[in-house]
Amino acid sequence: GSENTLDHDEGGFIGQNQAFALKGINKDVSIEWNIPDITPQNMIDYQYSKNDVQFEIKDLIQIIEKTIDREHEDERHNLTKGRLQKDLINWFIDDQFKLFYKKQDLSKTFDATFTLLIDASASMHDKMDETIKGVVLFHETLKSLNIKHEILAFNEDAFEADQRQQPNIIDEIINYNYSIFEKEGPRIMTLEPQDDNRDGVAIRIASERLLQRSHEQRFLIVFSDGEPSAFNYSQDGILDTYEAVERARKFGIEVFNVFLSQEPITEDIEQTIHNIYGQFALFVEGVEHLPSHLSPCLLY
């Protein structure tokens, strides 16, 4: 079971930013929001999954902390106590120690937010277990660092979609406002493969929500196996998804794709994903390799 959340948080306000409006090939898409219920079994499974990635969590925490440290160094370069105040009149008024001021210490807070977007289509059936571990790894890492984030899963209802309307379902797995609380994590275990995937729509929705956040850096990480597939979408889906990614980047959102699998990844799939995401596409065979693959994206 799940509860409909059209008015939950910003769930009901999609399409206010014209840059991300659903039009053209997506003009007849309807959006339904859900919050999946957490079962006792989800809670048990979550503990197992968390234990599976405990070492990777430590690695990813270190990588993000390095990113924070580098920002510190850039900001404090050549200054003994912090950034030089613009108003040099203070030199004459106060003693010289007050000439410098420190920006708020960011060692425990990182002025960034993340949205994880998970393709919950049928083609993910053999990749979902590994993807869930990757999402748990991210959630636990960001929670440890006190970084607010949102996790959404998306699919299109293949049985209800027709010329008139294409219902797309967004599952709110982790709510931004509650993302650093303990009790939310087990909802990640509700992720399961459903029907089709209209990636361009999901990316526009996630981007619009990200732009409502006041953080300096915004990351959108799409966990997907590549090719979009939905009603009347197959031919133009790749182009539509590419356009959604490019639009998000124009607004300063850092977008990249993560393909997590235990199986070798074919060249055809790699090429499709590169066509959409450019160089910011990660192909990872096994969640244990995810931190090392992410490092260049976060530290570039």
Give, region by region, the residue ranges found by the protein language model.
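Secondary-structure transition/capping motifs at alpha-helix termini
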Residues: 140-148, 211-216, 247-251
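C-terminal helix of von Willebrand factor
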Residues: 274-300
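Von Willebrand factor
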Residues: 106-217, 219-222, 257-264
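Acidic/polar low-complexity segments with low predicted structural confidence
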Residues: 1-112
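Short, contiguous acidic/charged loop-to-helix segments that flank catalytic cores in large enzymes
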Residues: 121-129, 188-198, 209-211, 227-239, ...
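Feature representing long, continuous alpha-helical segments
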Residues: 116, 122, 133-140, 149, ...
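VWA/integrin I-like adhesion module and closely mimicked acidic/polar interface patches used
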Residues: 207, 226-275
